[in-house]
A protein has these predicted regions:
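Extended beta-strand/beta-hairpin segments
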Residues: 2-53, 60-144
Length: 144
């Protein structure tokens, strides 16, 4: 049984399932059947995964935005602050984008800004009380 109705002209409906296996092990499956395994004791915690998801969502925008440029590596260093009381939500997130290639820094910065202002759905899921900042670092191809 789906809790939400199927897609309409105003929204896209997404389905998934998470299932506990044993101990701290669980898995998630999306509506396409793709599976992710989790272990909150011996792997990333749900909050760590959430932080990584904002990085991967926005990094995908950067890679797609640079598709006509010469580059061979993109990564994002992530840091976050959390509230000290329950619920221990994120209060601040910083993403430092690294691009190795022959790419103008102002282009990377513009793509990153557009990602967070418009395209990255995960970034927009965060409460407006969370401060999200970002910076960009270029690395020459000779560092390969």
């Amino acid at each position: 049984m789906h809790l939400l109705q199927e897609s309409t002209a105003r929204s896209i409906c997404m389905h998934g399932r998470v299932e506990w296996v044993s101990g701290s092990k669980a898995f998630g499956v999306n509506d396409s059947g793709d599976r992710l395994d989790f272990d909150w004791d011996d792997g990333p915690t749900p909050m760590q995964v959430t932080l990584q998801m904002i990085g991967i969502c926005s990094m995908a925008d950067v890679v797609l935005g640079l598709k006509e440029r010469v580059f061979d590596k993109v990564w994002v260093e992530l840091s976050a602050e959390r509230a000290t009381t329950t619920p221990r939500v994120f209060t601040a997130v910083h993403l430092e984008y690294h691009v190795r290639g022959d790419v103008p820094l102002n282009l990377v910065e513009r793509i990153v800004k557009m990602s967070h202002d418009k395209y990255c759905s995960v970034s927009h899921m965060f409460n407006e009380n969370i401060t999200i900042t970002h910076s960009s670092v270029l690395h020459p191809l000779s560092e390969a």
